[in-house]
Amino acid sequence: MQATAVVETDSDKSYHKNGGHLQNDKLYYPKKENMLFSNGCNRVKLTFPDGEGDSLTTDERTNVKENSSVDKRDLSELSFSETQDTNVENLFSQSSEFEDNIEYAFLNETYSIHYSESKLKDENILHLYSELDPEVHERVEVFFDTFGPQGNNDIGLGRSCEALGSACGDMQKSDVREDSQQEYHSAELECLSAHLAVDPAKTVSRSSLDVSEWRTSSYTFKCGGNLEVNRGKLESGPIPFLESLNGFSPKCSPQVSTSPSSDMLKEYHEPKYEKYKEQEVGLTYHKTFDDILQRSSSPLNSQKVPEPLVYAKEMKSQTIEGKDFYGDRIFQNRALQHPENAMFPQDHALETPLKALDAHQLSGPYVLDDSVISLCGSLQYNSLPEPGFYSPVMPRVAVTDSQAEVAGSCLHHVQGSATNKTCSLMKEMCLKSGPDAANCVALGQQTLDVSGRANVSSSVVSTASTTETKTVRRSQPEEWQRDRQSVACNTDWSCGQQCRSARAAALGSDSGRPLSTDCLNCGNSMDENSLELRKTPDKQRHPERAFQLCEEMALPSKCCEKTTERAVKAETHLLDVCYQMCHHHCHHIYKLVMGSRAGLSRNLPTDSAQKELGTALLSVLEDLKARYMNLKGKVHKGIPLEELPPLSVESKLLSAFSDFASRLMKEEACSLSGANSELDNQSLPEVAISPSLLKTLSQMSSISDSSHPKQDKLPMNNIFKNCDINIDFNHLKLNDKESKNVHEASEDWFDATERLTGTDFSVTQENITESEDWDPKNPLESELKTIERLRRGKGFLIHVGGLCPSVSEADLRSHFQKYQVSEISIYDSNTNYRYASLACAKNSNAKMAVKEMNGVEINGKSVNVRLVKIPGEYIPPLLSTAGNNISMNHLERNSSKDATSAASTCRLPIARSGQLESEQDSEFLPLVQGVRENCNQVKSGQSLPETPFQFIPPHTLNLRSFTKIMKRLAELHPEISRDHIIEALQEVRINHKGFLNGLSINTIVKMTSSFLRNAASRLK
């Protein structure tokens, strides 16, 4: 029977070849007249008329080769003949017509073939497995390929006829003798029985593949339509043609589509060959199945898959073909024995499983190009020129030492005579396919070397999205998988122990058993490596680039890690600062409240307040620490600090202390400068309990508050409440300049003719006696005691202030030697202010010292010298020393010419009427005892004022003269308020260089009255 192939390249032309003669005529098909396909695509029609069984002779094949030298021939067809027994009928019937949508990519390009569902036009089923005469083994089938691009009528097949003649010439030389064929029948039968599957559910149909080598000249073709134009150039030389397409069993791969030819065989043989099994020995034929066709709506169909180079080793072989019919399924086994030198050192078996989609169906038999082995329609093979003869043997894959690791194929490095080949590198990247084109599988198994039975399984799973290539060698299975690394997109060289176990079990039980779906899906985890795969060829040629690439890939992660660590460290430090601030705030509030506890203890017992306050503070600190540790842990976990709640503290103080600040401000803001109280000249306690004394005591209390918050301040606060004194704490601290001004502004408001020595000091003497029992432990109290002792012994004191640190007692004695200084005492303070007290025996010497030495420089620094005691006056030490310069400070502050500024300053209380005087006299007596108790509680030696305690002249305490002056001025200017009169007195003092000493009361009244009249005239 002779097979005739007709290829029609456009709508009106077809080329017919019969027996090697080319005819440019219209093909007439006796049964099917419609030879044209829709969509303007190229048509392929295969006819096998019955009764034509003559084979081509050698001369005819030579003629074919000569006639095929015509350039630009749009025809590629092969004729093959097989001798068949007369008993076999209808071996090949009319083939089916297909609507084809074909893409081809050639040499470094990809192609995909889309076939629509096959429409079987004939009821005669193609018999793939029929009984043939053993003599057919000497005849070799000829392959032919038909390229049909979509939407393009050009088929650039070049010199395909010439290639056909060359291939036929090689086939004639490589025919296998009948004698050599019969020798292997027995061995092949034994191998066939061993590899033949018994269980129909686990057996897959297999078709063996042969290799054909064509020597063709270079040509170029295009693919039209909506597909990308692909150009390929095929080099001259032998091209191995490997085909192995088998269908999986339903158990292994549920998505395997059944070939229409298999279904037809099932329908044809089911009534006739039920439970029938036969084996046919000694036939050589070429069977070509269609490749797995992808029909996916995804635009990712035209994806590119690795392109390995496959080389064939010419050798003689004999095949044993077996086919089984189990009810509704047909299984075929074929073994190929290699009597000559094999390419692998060990005998191996090659199996090529391919996974198919449910939506794709295998069409009827058609012919693929010999230079392309399509695994899932994406693999591409290229061959280099190699002399040799045609031999229908299995292809051999080999690599050189430099290319033992090849992308896209699992090629084993082999040492042998015929291994001087090179494997192709990855030329294209696998694109990620859609979900409907991800599981295309086909299984092809080939058995090598029946006698050895040492199997090497090379499983190639090629899909649009997953390509899994495995090679297992029995002697070194672990080493191979450990040394090989995937360099292709979605290519996994080692599927793990599970895949190896499944494959070993499949090979041990039956070589035809397909791999498990788990093994086929192992390559799905390689989608992320597509970026790295582009650089794999460079890594193979330049190993140093791989190390550089690793460093570059690791650099961003290290940089990000360091940046994150720095950010966490900075936020942790900021959180620590916030915690310390909150902690300090809690302690500050505690000290402040405890310092004022004495003033508030009139409503709360002291012990109860202290306990409750301490408990509240501990609770606040514990809660603060807990929230701090919680925030710190979250920061270490990577949560930004700005997204966390701020670290704050809430004061859980007692309700009794909650209004402490408001009450304190209220007491400070309270001013009773408009009081009309006047002190009587008959009451000595009026002089003793003067406002200056009260302010001095308040200064002492504030000093002790800042150093010892826990000390009681009850006497001080009682004085504040009972006397209603306006205390401005901001003016209790003086700098050196203010101190000098205070010393210079010693106010001697007294009448020169008035002497106060006749006054009874009985009450004050009692206080003096009690004050001698004090336990002075700070410099302030020591100074008071020293002054008291000096006053009693000498009676005349001189204050020398502003001493530099280098001034010693000897220096002062040398400067004040002519003034007959009997005793010198030097005092230091924390503010680097030093002063000295000098005792003079005579009043004249003291006055002369003040007049001459005031402003004199001692060791480079000028000093201010003032007189402390005036002759004829004896003031109790406590009262005289307690009268601080605070009263002078108040007068100094209120010396501003602006009348509005004077209203906000502290003012000295004015004596009221006689009734008020008697009331105050009764209140002042117990307050003096409170002052003594308060002074007894001063324990620390570190509680020194920022400025030293200044000695105030005793005339400041003589309020009787001040009362007289205010009374006279009020009588002269009744329309002027008391505040304005006091401001006028201050202005007079400032205009008189800050001193009113030596001026009589009448002079002071005249000067003040004149100032008031001038001010009133200016206002008008």
From Swiss-Prot:
GO terms for cellular component: catalytic step 2 spliceosome; cytoplasm; intercellular bridge. Residues 1-23, 50-70 are annotated as: Disordered. PROSITE patterns: RRM (PS50102). Its main location: cytoplasm. Residues 58-70 have a biased composition (Basic and acidic residues). Coiled coil: none annotated. Pfam families: RRM_1, TTC3_9th. Component of intercellular bridges during meiosis. Intercellular bridges are evolutionarily conserved structures that connect differentiating germ cells. Not required for fertility. This is RNA-binding protein 44. The lineage of its organism: Eukaryota, Metazoa, Chordata, Craniata, Vertebrata. The gene is Rbm44.
